[in-house]
Amino acid sequence: MAGQKIRIRLKAYDHEAIDASARKIVETVTRTGARVVGPVPLPTEKNVYCVIRSPHKYKDSREHFEMRTHKRLIDILEPTPKTVDALMRIDLPASVDVNIQ
């Protein structure tokens, strides 16, 4: 697997969960002997939803809700078969979306 690279993208609404998951992945990969670049924080995506507070009228009274999606990028350089096996066995929270390329 020399010369190859594994790119892991993490997405989550909770920044503490994504940071803990990234830390766990980096620790696991460094234990197996591969080189790690990251975690690199990518721009946070912010979605704002505007809702009228009243069910009937009073359009001037509105409430804003926002959803922030935090993203991290981890590159694993020169992965070994032991690294890939360790990544498959790692246990991450369900709130973190993992995309491996």
Swiss-Prot record:
GO biological process: translation
Entry's Gene Ontology molecular function annotations: structural constituent of ribosome; tRNA binding
Keywords: Ribonucleoprotein, Ribosomal protein
Domain of life: Bacteria
Record GO cellular component, one term: ribosome
Subunit structure, interactors included: Part of the 30S ribosomal subunit.
Family from the record: Belongs to the universal ribosomal protein uS10 family.
The protein's role, per its UniProt record: Involved in the binding of tRNA to the ribosomes.
The protein's name in its UniProt record: Small ribosomal subunit protein uS10
Source species taxonomy: Bacteria, Bacillati, Actinomycetota, Actinomycetes, Pseudonocardiales
